[in-house]
């Protein structure tokens, strides 16, 4: 990946964390820290219900915050994972949870996270 710095790689589902234990989180964070050092990797935060079928804001918050802190707002993208997410939640719960998680970000940071980064990376 470092050999081709102009190719943008999107890491899907925040690296797909499967479990919500402290040991798993620490191991996941260690891997994400290594990945985040590669500047052409963008982290798409989506589908966290796949590893946590009864997820809450509090259960996903450490994963979301870690991604945002490691990759920075400029290299994170919000996404849903429909229709798979519908197995574990509903659309308004997902959207409202992420709105709550990002409430302290500036308007520019929210715009970047929720749509501007995706527009740039996907060329839409």
Predicted feature locations:
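Tryptophan-centric aromatic hotspots in well-structured domains and transmembrane helices
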Residues: 28-31, 55, 59, 82, ...
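Short Gly/Pro-enriched loop/turn and capping motifs at secondary-structure junctions
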Residues: 48-50, 82-85
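Catalytic pocket-lining loop regions of alpha/beta-barrel enzymes
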Residues: 1-77
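Divalent metal-coordination and catalytic microenvironments
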Residues: 13, 43, 81, 110, ...
